[in-house]
Amino acid sequence: MTTTETTAQPWWGKGSVSATLLILFVFAASLAADKWVSNSQLTLPLLLAAVVSMAVAGLGIPRLKALKMGQVIREEGPSGHQSKSGTPTMGGLLVVPVGVILGSWITREPEASQQLLAVSGVTLAYMLIGGFDDWRSLTRRTNTGLTPRGKLLLQTTAAFVFLAIAAWQGWINSSVALPFGQSLPLGLLIWPLGLFVFLAESNATNLTDGLDGLASGCGALVFTGLALQLMLRGNHGDPALAGYCMTMAGTWLGFLVFNRHPARVFMGDTGSLAMGAALTAIALLSNSLWPLLVMGGVFLAESLSVIIQVWVFKATKGADGQGRRVFRMAPLHHHFELGGTSERTLVPCFWTATAALVVLGLLLRPFG
C-alpha cells in the first residue's frame, strides 16, 4: 500500500461510500426520467440487470479464483499496484452476457429486436476478443496477450461485420446529428468513421480500466446518459435502445459492487472491450456519436494522453533512446497517481467528471 493510500481519506473517497453514491445517482436519474419523460421505462431494466449482474458476479468470483485467473501487474506501472497482483480478472465474462441477454429482451418490435441482436453480437464478439487476450496474458504470466496487430485485426473484423449488417438493413444515418438542429453530412464516409469509432472507443475504455471501479463506474454513467438523451429526442424517444443502455448500465453497477476499491475482481479486456463496442454500436444506430463523444470525455482524455505521450516521446527521442514525456505516466489516471493523488480519491473525481459530462451532453444533445 502506498503512502498516499494510508493517509486519511475524505468520506467520499471511501470505496463503498463513493460507489453507493454513484449507484444512487444513476437510479435517481432513471426514476426521474420515468416520472417526467414520456414513454420512459428505464428503471426496471436497470434494476433487473444490476441485481442479476451482482448475483452472477458474486457466485462467479470464487470460480475465477479457483481457476487461478489472477491479474498480472506490469512492473513498469505504479508501485502501489503490485498489491493487486493475483486479483481475479476476466470479470467481464461473468457480467457482459447478463447485459446482452437481458438487453435483447427489451422489445418484441421486429426491427428494433434485430438491431438489439446486432448490438449484442458485436458486444459478445469484442468480449471474446478481450477474453482471448486476457487468457493469453494469464497463460504466459505477462501483462500482454495478443499482439497489437492481431488484436486490431480481430476488432476490425468484428466491427466490419456489424457495419455490413447495418448497411444492408439501412440502419445508420449518413449525417451525424449535432446540437442546435445542425448535422454533418458524411455520405459514404460514415462507414470508415464508424469503424474508427469502434476501434477508438473500445481501446479507450480498455485504457480507462486501470483503477478499481474506474471503467465500470464511468461506463455505467455514459450508458445512462445515452439512454436519457435517447428518450429526450423526438416525440417518443427510442425505448428499445434506451432500455438496452440501461441494462448495460445496470450490469456495470452490479459489477461495481465487487470492482470498487479494494477490487475483488477486474473486468479485464473481456469487459472493457465489450463495453466500448456496445457504446459504439448503440451510438451508431441511434445517431448519437456526438453525445457519446461528449459524455465519454473521460475515455477520450485517457486515450489522448497515451497518444500524446507516445508521439512526443518518439518525436523528441535522442541518440540515447530517451525522449520527453508530457505526463508522468500514461494513461492519464496514472499521471495523477504518480503526482500523489490516491486511487480512492482519484476514481470518484473521474466519476464526477463523467457525470458532469453526461449533464453537458444532455444539454447539448441533438434534437429529433
Curated annotation (Swiss-Prot):
Reactions it catalyzes: UDP-N-acetyl-alpha-D-muramoyl-L-alanyl-gamma-D-glutamyl-meso-2,6-diaminopimeloyl-D-alanyl-D-alanine + di-trans,octa-cis-undecaprenyl phosphate = di-trans,octa-cis-undecaprenyl diphospho-N-acetyl-alpha-D-muramoyl-L-alanyl-D-glutamyl-meso-2,6-diaminopimeloyl-D-alanyl-D-alanine + UMP
GO MF annotation, one: metal ion binding
Entry membrane topology: Multi-pass membrane protein
Keyword Cell division set for record: yes
GO biological-process terms attached to the record: cell division; cell wall organization; peptidoglycan biosynthetic process; regulation of cell shape
Cofactor or coenzyme needed: Mg(2+)
PROSITE patterns per UniProt: MRAY_1, MRAY_2
Cellular compartments annotated: Cell inner membrane
EC assignment: 2.7.8.13
Protein's pathway: Cell wall biogenesis; peptidoglycan biosynthesis
Family named by the database record: Belongs to the glycosyltransferase 4 family. MraY subfamily.
Reported function: Catalyzes the initial step of the lipid cycle reactions in the biosynthesis of the cell wall peptidoglycan: transfers peptidoglycan precursor phospho-MurNAc-pentapeptide from UDP-MurNAc-pentapeptide onto the lipid carrier undecaprenyl phosphate, yielding undecaprenyl-pyrophosphoryl-MurNAc-pentapeptide, known as lipid I.
Record-given protein name: Phospho-N-acetylmuramoyl-pentapeptide-transferase
Native source organism of the sequence: Synechococcus sp. (strain CC9902)
